[in-house]
Amino acid sequence: MLVKTYCAAVMGLEAITVTIEVSMTQGVMFHLTGLADTAVKESHDRIRSALANIGYRFPVADITINMAPADVKKEGSSYDLPLAIGILAANGKIADGQLSDYMIVGEVGLDGSLQPIRGALPIAIKARADKFKGLIVPRQNVREAAVVNNLQVYGMDSLVDVINFFNGSLDYQPTIIDTRKEFFEHQYHFDYDFADVKGQESVKRALEVAAAGGHNLIMIGPPGSGKSMMAKRLPSILPPLSLAESLETTQIHSVAGKLGKDMSLIFQRPFRAPHHTISQVGLAGGSNKAMPGEVSLAHNGVLFLDELTEFNRATLEILRQPLEDRKITITRALYTVEYPCSLMLVASMNPCPCGYYGDPLHTCTCTPGQISRYLSKISGPLLDRIDIHCEIQAVPFSELSKMQPGEPSEQIRERVIAARKRQEERFKPYKGIHCNAMMTERMLHEFAEPDTASLDMLRMAMERLKLSARAYSRILKVARTIADLAGSEKVESVHIAEAIGYRNLDRGDWAERGC
Protein backbone atom coordinates (compact mmCIF):
# COMPACT_ATOMS: atom_id res chain seq x y z
CA MET A 1 0.00 0.00 0.00
CA LEU A 2 1.29 3.49 -0.88
CA VAL A 3 0.44 6.48 1.31
CA LYS A 4 1.52 10.12 1.03
CA THR A 5 1.89 12.70 3.80
CA TYR A 6 3.13 16.27 3.50
CA CYS A 7 5.57 18.36 5.52
CA ALA A 8 8.16 21.05 4.77
CA ALA A 9 11.90 21.70 4.76
CA VAL A 10 13.01 25.13 5.99
CA MET A 11 15.83 26.79 4.06
CA GLY A 12 16.60 30.28 5.28
CA LEU A 13 13.29 32.11 5.65
CA GLU A 14 11.60 29.98 3.01
CA ALA A 15 9.95 26.58 3.31
CA ILE A 16 9.80 23.91 0.62
CA THR A 17 6.96 21.40 0.59
CA VAL A 18 8.18 17.84 1.07
CA THR A 19 6.12 14.83 0.04
CA ILE A 20 6.67 11.68 2.09
CA GLU A 21 5.77 8.49 0.23
CA VAL A 22 5.41 5.36 2.35
CA SER A 23 5.22 1.99 0.61
CA MET A 24 4.67 -1.17 2.63
CA THR A 25 5.16 -4.66 1.19
CA GLN A 26 6.00 -8.12 2.49
CA GLY A 27 9.42 -8.29 4.15
CA VAL A 28 11.30 -6.95 7.17
CA MET A 29 13.54 -4.16 5.81
CA PHE A 30 13.33 -0.39 6.40
CA HIS A 31 14.56 1.94 3.64
CA LEU A 32 14.67 5.75 3.85
CA THR A 33 15.65 7.76 0.76
CA GLY A 34 15.61 11.44 -0.20
CA LEU A 35 18.79 13.15 1.08
CA ALA A 36 17.96 12.74 4.78
CA ASP A 37 20.47 13.72 7.45
CA THR A 38 21.34 11.66 10.54
CA ALA A 39 18.52 13.09 12.67
CA VAL A 40 15.94 12.08 10.04
CA LYS A 41 17.41 8.60 9.70
CA GLU A 42 17.24 8.19 13.47
CA SER A 43 13.49 8.88 13.35
CA HIS A 44 12.97 5.16 12.72
CA ASP A 45 14.06 4.37 16.28
CA ARG A 46 12.08 7.22 17.85
CA ILE A 47 8.92 6.26 15.98
CA ARG A 48 9.28 2.57 16.89
CA SER A 49 9.59 3.43 20.59
CA ALA A 50 6.76 5.99 20.48
CA LEU A 51 4.36 3.54 18.83
CA ALA A 52 5.18 0.86 21.39
CA ASN A 53 4.57 3.27 24.28
CA ILE A 54 1.15 4.36 23.01
CA GLY A 55 -0.03 0.81 22.35
CA TYR A 56 0.75 0.35 18.65
CA ARG A 57 3.05 -2.23 17.16
CA PHE A 58 5.59 -1.15 14.58
CA PRO A 59 4.63 -2.95 11.34
CA VAL A 60 6.53 -6.12 10.49
CA ALA A 61 6.92 -5.40 6.79
CA ASP A 62 9.28 -4.12 4.15
CA ILE A 63 8.88 -0.34 4.51
CA THR A 64 10.26 1.99 1.86
CA ILE A 65 10.03 5.73 2.47
CA ASN A 66 10.91 8.39 -0.09
CA MET A 67 11.14 12.08 0.76
CA ALA A 68 10.68 14.25 -2.33
CA PRO A 69 12.13 16.40 -3.79
CA ALA A 70 15.22 14.26 -3.43
CA ASP A 71 17.67 17.11 -4.09
CA VAL A 72 16.55 19.11 -1.02
CA LYS A 73 18.47 18.37 2.17
CA LYS A 74 16.16 17.09 4.94
CA GLU A 75 17.54 18.13 8.33
CA GLY A 76 16.28 17.88 11.89
CA SER A 77 13.61 15.95 13.73
CA SER A 78 10.52 17.81 12.45
CA TYR A 79 9.86 14.94 10.01
CA ASP A 80 9.14 12.44 12.82
CA LEU A 81 5.41 13.12 12.94
CA PRO A 82 4.61 12.95 9.19
CA LEU A 83 6.76 9.80 8.93
CA ALA A 84 4.91 8.17 11.84
CA ILE A 85 1.50 9.10 10.42
CA GLY A 86 2.52 7.78 7.01
CA ILE A 87 3.63 4.45 8.47
CA LEU A 88 0.42 4.07 10.48
CA ALA A 89 -1.73 4.98 7.46
CA ALA A 90 0.12 2.50 5.24
CA ASN A 91 -0.52 -0.14 7.92
CA GLY A 92 -4.24 0.65 7.95
CA LYS A 93 -4.30 2.20 11.43
CA ILE A 94 -5.23 5.68 10.19
CA ALA A 95 -7.82 6.65 7.60
CA ASP A 96 -5.87 8.27 4.77
CA GLY A 97 -8.75 10.23 3.24
CA GLN A 98 -7.72 13.59 4.74
CA LEU A 99 -3.94 13.26 4.69
CA SER A 100 -3.61 15.26 1.48
CA ASP A 101 -5.44 18.22 3.08
CA TYR A 102 -2.91 18.83 5.85
CA MET A 103 0.75 19.63 6.25
CA ILE A 104 2.17 17.84 9.30
CA VAL A 105 5.36 18.67 11.25
CA GLY A 106 6.70 17.80 14.68
CA GLU A 107 9.30 15.88 16.63
CA VAL A 108 8.08 12.73 18.36
CA GLY A 109 9.40 11.81 21.81
CA LEU A 110 9.93 8.21 22.88
CA ASP A 111 6.71 8.40 24.91
CA GLY A 112 4.71 9.66 21.94
CA SER A 113 4.69 13.30 23.03
CA LEU A 114 5.25 16.03 20.45
CA GLN A 115 8.21 18.35 20.89
CA PRO A 116 8.56 21.86 19.39
CA ILE A 117 10.36 22.51 16.11
CA ARG A 118 12.11 25.42 14.46
CA GLY A 119 10.58 27.36 11.58
CA ALA A 120 6.88 26.79 12.26
CA LEU A 121 5.98 30.24 10.89
CA PRO A 122 7.67 29.84 7.46
CA ILE A 123 6.10 26.39 7.25
CA ALA A 124 2.64 27.83 7.95
CA ILE A 125 3.15 30.50 5.28
CA LYS A 126 4.11 27.77 2.79
CA ALA A 127 1.12 25.62 3.77
CA ARG A 128 -1.25 28.48 2.99
CA ALA A 129 0.56 29.28 -0.26
CA ASP A 130 0.21 25.65 -1.40
CA LYS A 131 -3.54 25.65 -0.62
CA PHE A 132 -3.44 23.14 2.23
CA LYS A 133 -6.57 23.16 4.35
CA GLY A 134 -4.64 23.07 7.59
CA LEU A 135 -1.39 22.55 9.45
CA ILE A 136 -0.69 20.23 12.38
CA VAL A 137 2.11 21.29 14.73
CA PRO A 138 3.22 20.58 18.32
CA ARG A 139 1.27 22.56 20.90
CA GLN A 140 4.30 24.76 21.69
CA ASN A 141 4.39 26.02 18.08
CA VAL A 142 0.69 26.63 17.57
CA ARG A 143 0.59 30.36 18.36
CA GLU A 144 3.43 31.33 16.05
CA ALA A 145 1.90 29.29 13.21
CA ALA A 146 -1.63 30.57 13.86
CA VAL A 147 -0.70 34.16 12.95
CA VAL A 148 -1.10 33.06 9.31
CA ASN A 149 -4.66 33.84 8.26
CA ASN A 150 -6.88 31.56 6.17
CA LEU A 151 -5.16 28.42 7.46
CA GLN A 152 -6.51 26.03 10.10
CA VAL A 153 -3.68 25.43 12.58
CA TYR A 154 -4.01 22.61 15.11
CA GLY A 155 -1.70 22.29 18.11
CA MET A 156 -1.32 18.70 19.29
CA ASP A 157 0.24 17.33 22.47
CA SER A 158 0.93 13.77 21.39
CA LEU A 159 0.97 11.28 18.55
CA VAL A 160 -2.28 9.85 19.95
CA ASP A 161 -3.99 13.22 19.40
CA VAL A 162 -2.98 13.24 15.73
CA ILE A 163 -4.18 9.65 15.25
CA ASN A 164 -7.53 10.53 16.82
CA PHE A 165 -7.76 13.67 14.66
CA PHE A 166 -7.46 11.76 11.38
CA ASN A 167 -9.66 8.91 12.55
CA GLY A 168 -12.34 11.36 13.68
CA SER A 169 -12.37 9.98 17.23
CA LEU A 170 -12.31 13.45 18.80
CA ASP A 171 -13.36 16.89 17.61
CA TYR A 172 -10.38 19.24 17.60
CA GLN A 173 -10.70 22.99 17.03
CA PRO A 174 -8.07 25.09 15.26
CA THR A 175 -6.27 27.85 17.14
CA ILE A 176 -7.38 31.30 16.03
CA ILE A 177 -5.40 34.45 16.82
CA ASP A 178 -6.52 38.02 16.19
CA THR A 179 -3.11 39.06 14.88
CA ARG A 180 -3.83 42.75 14.47
CA LYS A 181 -5.43 43.09 17.90
CA GLU A 182 -2.51 41.42 19.69
CA PHE A 183 0.00 43.37 17.64
CA PHE A 184 -1.37 46.82 18.43
CA GLU A 185 -2.00 45.96 22.10
CA HIS A 186 1.66 45.14 22.79
CA GLN A 187 3.51 47.71 20.68
CA TYR A 188 4.33 50.20 23.41
CA HIS A 189 5.18 48.00 26.40
CA PHE A 190 8.80 48.77 27.37
CA ASP A 191 10.87 47.75 30.37
CA TYR A 192 13.07 50.85 30.23
CA ASP A 193 12.35 54.57 29.85
CA PHE A 194 14.56 57.61 29.33
CA ALA A 195 12.71 59.29 32.20
CA ASP A 196 14.98 57.21 34.46
CA VAL A 197 18.10 58.91 33.06
CA LYS A 198 19.22 62.08 34.83
CA GLY A 199 21.50 64.43 32.95
CA GLN A 200 23.44 63.27 29.86
CA GLU A 201 21.41 65.57 27.62
CA SER A 202 24.00 65.56 24.83
CA VAL A 203 24.01 61.76 24.74
CA LYS A 204 20.22 61.62 24.72
CA ARG A 205 20.28 64.04 21.80
CA ALA A 206 22.71 61.81 19.90
CA LEU A 207 20.50 58.78 20.54
CA GLU A 208 17.44 60.73 19.36
CA VAL A 209 19.22 61.67 16.13
CA ALA A 210 20.35 58.06 15.65
CA ALA A 211 16.80 56.77 16.20
CA ALA A 212 15.28 59.37 13.88
CA GLY A 213 17.55 58.50 10.95
CA GLY A 214 18.35 54.84 11.64
CA HIS A 215 22.03 55.71 12.11
CA ASN A 216 24.71 53.50 13.64
CA LEU A 217 26.18 54.95 16.83
CA ILE A 218 29.10 54.43 19.19
CA MET A 219 29.37 55.80 22.73
CA ILE A 220 32.82 56.40 24.22
CA GLY A 221 33.14 57.00 27.93
CA PRO A 222 34.55 55.78 31.26
CA PRO A 223 33.09 52.90 33.29
CA GLY A 224 29.88 53.80 35.10
CA SER A 225 28.97 56.68 32.81
CA GLY A 226 25.70 55.04 31.72
CA LYS A 227 26.53 53.75 28.24
CA SER A 228 24.74 50.40 28.63
CA MET A 229 21.86 51.96 30.55
CA MET A 230 21.06 54.37 27.74
CA ALA A 231 21.57 51.79 24.99
CA LYS A 232 18.91 49.57 26.63
CA ARG A 233 16.46 52.47 26.44
CA LEU A 234 16.99 53.11 22.74
CA PRO A 235 14.18 50.73 21.58
CA SER A 236 11.70 52.79 23.63
CA ILE A 237 12.19 55.81 21.32
CA LEU A 238 12.30 53.95 18.01
CA PRO A 239 9.25 54.01 15.72
CA PRO A 240 7.00 50.98 16.32
CA LEU A 241 7.29 47.96 14.05
CA SER A 242 4.86 47.76 11.17
CA LEU A 243 2.90 44.52 10.86
CA ALA A 244 5.00 43.50 7.84
CA GLU A 245 8.24 44.18 9.75
CA SER A 246 6.93 42.23 12.72
CA LEU A 247 6.10 39.22 10.55
CA GLU A 248 9.54 39.23 8.89
CA THR A 249 11.31 39.60 12.24
CA THR A 250 9.23 36.79 13.73
CA GLN A 251 10.15 34.52 10.81
CA ILE A 252 13.85 34.94 11.57
CA HIS A 253 13.37 34.18 15.26
CA SER A 254 11.13 31.23 14.37
CA VAL A 255 13.83 29.71 12.16
CA ALA A 256 16.37 30.23 14.96
CA GLY A 257 14.05 28.59 17.51
CA LYS A 258 13.99 31.75 19.65
CA LEU A 259 10.21 32.09 20.08
CA GLY A 260 8.62 30.96 23.33
CA LYS A 261 5.57 28.71 23.37
CA ASP A 262 3.22 31.58 24.24
CA MET A 263 4.55 33.92 21.55
CA SER A 264 2.76 34.64 18.30
CA LEU A 265 4.47 37.72 16.87
CA ILE A 266 7.42 39.83 17.95
CA PHE A 267 5.73 43.10 18.82
CA GLN A 268 8.73 45.32 19.55
CA ARG A 269 11.99 46.01 17.79
CA PRO A 270 14.61 43.42 18.78
CA PHE A 271 17.46 44.42 21.07
CA ARG A 272 20.34 41.95 20.83
CA ALA A 273 23.37 42.31 23.08
CA PRO A 274 25.82 39.42 22.48
CA HIS A 275 28.81 38.92 24.79
CA HIS A 276 32.22 39.99 23.50
CA THR A 277 33.34 36.33 23.36
CA ILE A 278 30.86 35.57 20.57
CA SER A 279 32.26 33.64 17.60
CA GLN A 280 32.15 34.68 13.97
CA VAL A 281 29.43 32.09 13.29
CA GLY A 282 27.41 33.30 16.28
CA LEU A 283 27.51 36.88 15.01
CA ALA A 284 27.06 36.36 11.27
CA GLY A 285 25.17 33.05 11.29
CA GLY A 286 26.05 29.72 9.78
CA SER A 287 26.82 26.30 11.31
CA ASN A 288 25.95 23.18 9.37
CA LYS A 289 22.27 24.23 9.21
CA ALA A 290 22.91 27.84 8.07
CA MET A 291 21.12 29.31 11.07
CA PRO A 292 20.68 33.08 11.45
CA GLY A 293 23.23 34.88 13.62
CA GLU A 294 22.95 37.91 15.87
CA VAL A 295 23.05 40.35 12.93
CA SER A 296 19.90 38.75 11.52
CA LEU A 297 18.20 38.32 14.90
CA ALA A 298 18.61 42.10 15.31
CA HIS A 299 16.87 42.75 11.97
CA ASN A 300 14.52 45.76 12.24
CA GLY A 301 16.00 46.48 15.66
CA VAL A 302 19.22 47.17 17.53
CA LEU A 303 22.47 45.21 17.76
CA PHE A 304 24.29 46.43 20.87
CA LEU A 305 27.99 45.58 21.19
CA ASP A 306 29.11 46.52 24.68
CA GLU A 307 32.87 46.93 25.24
CA LEU A 308 33.49 46.95 21.48
CA THR A 309 37.28 46.78 21.77
CA GLU A 310 37.02 43.48 23.68
CA PHE A 311 35.51 41.73 20.65
CA ASN A 312 37.81 39.73 18.41
CA ARG A 313 38.85 42.02 15.56
CA ALA A 314 38.19 39.35 12.90
CA THR A 315 34.69 38.90 14.31
CA LEU A 316 34.00 42.64 14.11
CA GLU A 317 35.22 42.82 10.52
CA ILE A 318 32.39 40.47 9.54
CA LEU A 319 30.00 43.35 10.22
CA ARG A 320 31.32 45.48 7.38
CA GLN A 321 29.39 43.83 4.56
CA PRO A 322 26.06 43.31 6.42
CA LEU A 323 26.05 46.93 7.63
CA GLU A 324 26.49 48.13 4.05
CA ASP A 325 24.18 45.68 2.23
CA ARG A 326 21.63 45.11 5.03
CA LYS A 327 21.59 41.41 4.23
CA ILE A 328 23.93 38.48 4.73
CA THR A 329 24.45 35.41 2.55
CA ILE A 330 25.42 32.05 4.02
CA THR A 331 26.69 29.43 1.59
CA ARG A 332 26.81 25.70 2.23
CA ALA A 333 27.80 22.81 -0.05
CA LEU A 334 24.26 22.06 -1.21
CA TYR A 335 22.51 25.40 -0.86
CA THR A 336 22.77 29.12 -0.18
CA VAL A 337 20.47 31.12 2.09
CA GLU A 338 20.09 34.85 2.56
CA TYR A 339 18.92 36.57 5.73
CA PRO A 340 17.97 40.24 6.05
CA CYS A 341 19.87 42.30 8.62
CA SER A 342 18.64 45.87 8.40
CA LEU A 343 19.67 47.00 11.86
CA MET A 344 21.00 49.84 13.95
CA LEU A 345 24.45 49.08 15.29
CA VAL A 346 24.97 50.63 18.72
CA ALA A 347 28.35 50.12 20.37
CA SER A 348 30.06 51.28 23.52
CA MET A 349 33.68 51.36 24.56
CA ASN A 350 36.08 52.86 27.07
CA PRO A 351 38.36 55.60 25.71
CA CYS A 352 41.53 53.78 26.78
CA PRO A 353 42.72 50.54 28.47
CA CYS A 354 42.29 51.92 32.01
CA GLY A 355 38.97 53.51 31.04
CA TYR A 356 39.55 57.03 32.36
CA TYR A 357 41.13 58.92 29.47
CA GLY A 358 39.70 62.45 29.47
CA ASP A 359 37.69 61.84 32.67
CA PRO A 360 37.85 64.91 34.95
CA LEU A 361 37.18 62.78 38.04
CA HIS A 362 39.94 60.18 37.56
CA THR A 363 43.54 60.15 36.40
CA CYS A 364 44.32 58.16 33.27
CA THR A 365 47.36 55.89 33.66
CA CYS A 366 47.73 55.05 29.96
CA THR A 367 50.43 56.32 27.62
CA PRO A 368 49.55 57.84 24.23
CA GLY A 369 50.94 54.70 22.59
CA GLN A 370 48.69 52.43 24.67
CA ILE A 371 45.67 54.55 23.82
CA SER A 372 46.55 54.53 20.13
CA ARG A 373 46.93 50.73 20.11
CA TYR A 374 43.69 50.36 22.05
CA LEU A 375 41.72 52.43 19.54
CA SER A 376 43.35 50.62 16.62
CA LYS A 377 41.43 47.48 17.61
CA ILE A 378 38.56 49.02 15.65
CA SER A 379 39.41 49.23 11.97
CA GLY A 380 38.94 52.41 9.96
CA PRO A 381 36.49 50.82 7.49
CA LEU A 382 34.26 49.65 10.36
CA LEU A 383 34.44 53.03 12.07
CA ASP A 384 33.49 54.73 8.80
CA ARG A 385 30.24 52.74 8.85
CA ILE A 386 29.28 54.21 12.22
CA ASP A 387 27.55 57.53 11.61
CA ILE A 388 27.56 59.00 15.12
CA HIS A 389 30.47 59.03 17.60
CA CYS A 390 29.32 60.26 21.00
CA GLU A 391 31.50 61.07 24.01
CA ILE A 392 29.93 60.52 27.41
CA GLN A 393 31.11 61.51 30.89
CA ALA A 394 29.95 60.17 34.24
CA VAL A 395 27.63 62.51 36.15
CA PRO A 396 29.05 63.33 39.62
CA PHE A 397 26.88 62.10 42.49
CA SER A 398 26.64 65.61 43.94
CA GLU A 399 24.98 66.78 40.73
CA LEU A 400 23.02 63.57 40.15
CA SER A 401 21.13 63.90 43.43
CA LYS A 402 19.95 67.41 42.49
CA MET A 403 18.73 66.60 38.97
CA GLN A 404 15.12 66.14 37.97
CA PRO A 405 13.92 63.02 36.10
CA GLY A 406 14.63 63.08 32.39
CA GLU A 407 12.25 63.54 29.48
CA PRO A 408 10.02 60.47 29.04
CA SER A 409 10.66 58.15 26.10
CA GLU A 410 7.15 58.79 24.80
CA GLN A 411 7.89 62.45 24.12
CA ILE A 412 11.19 61.69 22.41
CA ARG A 413 9.53 58.95 20.36
CA GLU A 414 6.91 61.39 19.07
CA ARG A 415 9.66 63.59 17.60
CA VAL A 416 11.41 60.55 16.15
CA ILE A 417 8.21 59.29 14.52
CA ALA A 418 7.52 62.74 13.05
CA ALA A 419 11.02 62.81 11.52
CA ARG A 420 10.62 59.28 10.16
CA LYS A 421 7.32 60.22 8.53
CA ARG A 422 9.07 63.03 6.67
CA GLN A 423 11.65 60.53 5.47
CA GLU A 424 9.05 57.97 4.41
CA GLU A 425 7.28 60.63 2.37
CA ARG A 426 10.57 61.71 0.81
CA PHE A 427 11.60 58.18 -0.14
CA LYS A 428 8.24 56.91 -1.43
CA PRO A 429 9.51 56.61 -5.03
CA TYR A 430 12.57 54.62 -3.90
CA LYS A 431 12.05 50.93 -3.19
CA GLY A 432 13.73 49.63 -0.04
CA ILE A 433 14.74 53.06 1.26
CA HIS A 434 12.97 53.99 4.50
CA CYS A 435 15.28 56.32 6.42
CA ASN A 436 18.18 58.70 5.93
CA ALA A 437 20.81 56.13 6.87
CA MET A 438 19.86 54.17 3.74
CA MET A 439 20.36 57.05 1.28
CA THR A 440 22.56 56.48 -1.75
CA GLU A 441 25.12 58.99 -3.02
CA ARG A 442 22.69 60.20 -5.67
CA MET A 443 20.03 60.82 -3.02
CA LEU A 444 22.49 62.84 -0.95
CA HIS A 445 22.93 65.25 -3.85
CA GLU A 446 19.16 65.53 -4.18
CA PHE A 447 18.05 65.70 -0.54
CA ALA A 448 21.08 66.71 1.56
CA GLU A 449 23.03 69.13 -0.61
CA PRO A 450 24.53 71.78 1.73
CA ASP A 451 24.55 75.49 0.91
CA THR A 452 27.78 77.38 0.19
CA ALA A 453 28.51 78.32 3.82
CA SER A 454 27.82 74.77 5.00
CA LEU A 455 29.99 73.34 2.23
CA ASP A 456 32.93 75.54 3.27
CA MET A 457 32.51 74.43 6.88
CA LEU A 458 32.39 70.80 5.83
CA ARG A 459 35.43 71.14 3.57
CA MET A 460 37.45 72.62 6.43
CA ALA A 461 36.40 69.78 8.76
CA MET A 462 37.31 67.18 6.15
CA GLU A 463 40.81 68.64 5.82
CA ARG A 464 41.46 69.05 9.53
CA LEU A 465 40.09 65.65 10.58
CA LYS A 466 41.39 63.84 7.47
CA LEU A 467 37.99 62.28 6.91
CA SER A 468 37.29 59.66 4.25
CA ALA A 469 34.75 59.99 1.46
CA ARG A 470 32.48 57.60 3.35
CA ALA A 471 32.68 59.80 6.47
CA TYR A 472 31.68 62.78 4.30
CA SER A 473 28.54 60.91 3.25
CA ARG A 474 27.80 59.97 6.86
CA ILE A 475 27.97 63.60 7.94
CA LEU A 476 25.48 64.61 5.24
CA LYS A 477 23.10 61.79 6.19
CA VAL A 478 23.18 62.76 9.87
CA ALA A 479 22.76 66.45 8.97
CA ARG A 480 19.69 65.54 6.91
CA THR A 481 18.23 63.76 9.96
CA ILE A 482 18.94 66.73 12.23
CA ALA A 483 17.15 68.94 9.70
CA ASP A 484 14.18 66.55 9.71
CA LEU A 485 13.97 66.72 13.50
CA ALA A 486 13.98 70.51 13.21
CA GLY A 487 11.29 70.42 10.51
CA SER A 488 13.62 72.05 7.98
CA GLU A 489 13.36 71.32 4.27
CA LYS A 490 17.00 72.30 3.66
CA VAL A 491 20.23 71.22 5.31
CA GLU A 492 21.67 74.33 6.92
CA SER A 493 25.03 75.15 8.50
CA VAL A 494 23.71 74.56 12.03
CA HIS A 495 22.75 71.02 11.04
CA ILE A 496 26.13 70.39 9.42
CA ALA A 497 27.93 71.72 12.51
CA GLU A 498 26.09 69.33 14.82
CA ALA A 499 26.72 66.40 12.46
CA ILE A 500 30.46 67.17 12.33
CA GLY A 501 30.45 67.13 16.15
CA TYR A 502 29.40 63.49 15.99
CA ARG A 503 32.71 62.40 14.36
CA ASN A 504 34.75 62.38 17.60
CA LEU A 505 36.82 59.30 16.83
CA ASP A 506 37.99 60.83 13.56
CA ARG A 507 39.94 63.49 15.46
CA GLY A 508 43.68 63.01 15.37
CA ASP A 509 44.30 64.25 18.92
CA TRP A 510 42.67 61.39 20.82
CA ALA A 511 45.94 59.90 22.01
CA GLU A 512 47.50 63.27 22.84
CA ARG A 513 45.03 65.19 24.97
CA GLY A 514 44.14 64.67 28.62
CA CYS A 515 47.05 62.51 29.83
Residues covered by each model-derived region:
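Peripheral, non-AAA+ core regions of ATP-driven protein-machinery
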Residues: 1-218, 222-228, 331, 471-472, ...
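Short beta-strand elements
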Residues: 18-24, 283, 387-390
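Basic, amphipathic alpha-helical bundle interface domains used for macromolecular binding and assembly
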Residues: 33-44, 59, 66-76, 290, ...
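Conserved alpha-helical scaffold flanking the Walker A/P-loop in AAA+ ATPase domains
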Residues: 208, 265, 270, 280-303, ...
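Walker A/P-loop
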Residues: 219-260
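The Walker A (P-loop) glycine that initiates the GxxxxGKT/S ATP-binding motif of P-loop NTPases
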Residues: 221, 285, 307
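Conserved inter-motif catalytic segment of the P-loop NTP-binding fold
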Residues: 245-279, 286-287, 393, 434-442, ...
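Walker B catalytic acidic pair
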Residues: 300, 306-307, 318
